[in-house]
Amino acid sequence: MKKAEKRIARDETEYFDYDFVVIGAGLSGMCAAIAAARRGVKTALIGDRPVLGGNASSEVGIDIDGAAYNSRWSVSVYARETGLIEEIKNRLYHFNRHDPEKGAAHDAALFDAVLAEKNIDLYLNTYADEVTCEGDRISSVGCVQLASERRLCFRAPLFADCTGDGSVGAKAGAKFRMGTEGYDEYKENLAPARPSSVTNGDTIMFHTVRMDTPQPYERPAFAYDVTKLSFFKGLGTNNRIFSKYTDGLYQGFWWVEFGGHLDTIRDNDEITWELRKIVYGLWDYIKNSGKFPEAANMKLTKVRPLAGKRESRRFIGDYVLNQNDVENKTPFADAAYIAGWPMDVHADYGVYDSRPATYWNFVPGMYNVPFRTLYSVNVENLFFAGRNTSCTRIANGSTRVMATCAAGGQAVGTGAYLCRKYGCTPRAVYREHIPELQKLLLRDDQTLMGYKEDYALENAVCTATSCKRTENADREELMPLDKSYVLALPVKERVDSLCIALKNEGDAAVLRWRVLEGDLPECYLPERIVREAETEIPAGADGWISLFPNVRPGKDGKVYLQFLPADGLSLYVSKESVTGIPTFICEEQEPSLRDRRRFAFTLSYKNICFSELQPACALFGAENVLSGYNRPYGMPNLWISDGKWGQELKISFSEKYVEEVHLVFNTELENDLISSQSAKVIRDYDLVLKGEREEVIPVRGNYGRVNRFAVGRKLTGVAVRPSENYGGKNFEIYGVKIY
């Protein structure tokens, strides 16, 4: 009898009221919840798994990719999403550097990010299985909490579906699409002639470690003998290669994909089992075929229990982003976040498809995504963020990666704050409050391409102990000119002359070089050849030579110098990059359907040495910390010191009441994944607040991009006195943001 009474009590529904309910605790949902909570919105974050992070969690183990894709191929170069996802990625590395498995430390870092917020209540193992609507609004979401057997009901004026599959919005009747649009609908030339149900498929990742002795492996009975599968003969081609991670280990293959021709929601279990059979079978082939001797001491420690899902439902918002917007960078007045991953559309049948595993359809650098893609066209209080936002399948190939999705989540959480502030709907935020939304997003370090902040400082004067010259003169090693290399130079007026360092180890030779120009300030994308020239290099030459481009920069504010291959010639390079002045490997190519660049570029980790730029161009002055951009956009937009000893950056201004001061450091936005601590981050410094009294705030052990300080009094100036970073030669600061 007592047991029956307990059972009845357990089945009673518990009711909870919040300002904002976020369903889905992946990175998108986390960022939506954190953004809202930090502005005082009482938020419930609901996830159906025992851990946070979604595809980035320990259960799935997918890397957090974004606009700076593959760290070397994005033409925007310094393209990594900032804001909350930058904070989370740096936190993950800092607490997870000795846990490449994405295991316990990884999960703990994500827990920390959410549990630090007093306005978030976290509900894990909680599945939303019921949605109640009143008219065109969701009034409540009913959930069952697994294991506890509790029945929970969440009521709120605002909801966000960040589930990936769009399960809550679908239950509410929100309009959505699933599959591929035909060409006629949006005139996307990458779309098929007719619509279909095809989506991108799923992938299961795994983890290995290297042991001191050989590790035997026996294929489980359920796994495939992959040598008997139809795709086996094609392995090693069509992007299906056995790639290793930077640690030299096999950690999973993105191209082990299945399910795009099925229903990735309804057929989830079938898809997952097929992938398991393939993964265990592939590891058997790697270990026991004799063709991978380097794997002898590798041990398979984990096959992720969940498949990483790329695509399923896509909701319909007030705007549907499409391929033409991505390629043409449609200038949306309601820009809410950036994207920049290629339009990555995978083969219909995944690993079983005879075509390439994917086409990385070119995107011309970062672009803005509108706020209207983040709320429902027909459910008036429903936001969404993640891979289920309002876009075509082709555009979704670019927006679906996790760092980009998380930036969308931050926009949603900030939009929810404005909805609560004004008692309005998401659509009303678009119609009436976009300038305020964008101002808040910029303040919180969200990147909106081409937008800059105004700190409203009167009579501001910036000075510094020193500023780096516009040069890269540390000749550390030689790089043979066996390929075509490009030096990208942001300049304010023109380049009449400069010096580069080279060595000729053969007979007298000719250095052939070009000057190119581009149009997009957010990119390093030369579009046209301005002039071509030749310079004679004597036999045995070893040192600096002068070049005379005599050109103005293009619309993007840059001059590109391309050095063509030459036998016997080598360029001197520096291992340390100068922010904003990258070096590229360049290959000329014909325009094609999938890649409209005339020149294909890969960012080089070795940087061409140059000096004596004329006319002199001071790119790294103290005044850059008030530029309002806080990342390269046309110009590098940061202060760089000349050396590290005794440096100080000072800003004085007319007396002003200051709420907060934000310092923005250089975490090297050119790297998509954070796999090492950026040497350029200022670790130790003192912040000096100047007014009626001077206050010195010591900071030690910083590793992040943005440091925030509450002030709450009148100031006449601030100063930053850096004392150490993580090994960089100079100190670098993007912004000193004074509010």
Language model: regions and residue ranges:
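Aromatic, loop-rich ligand-recognition surfaces of beta-strand-rich domains
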Residues: 484-486, 492, 499-505, 510-525, ...
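Noncatalytic modules at the cell exterior or secretory-pathway interfaces
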Residues: 497, 550-568, 711-723
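Conserved N-terminal/central alpha/beta ligand/cofactor-binding core
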Residues: 7-15, 35, 41-42, 47-137, ...
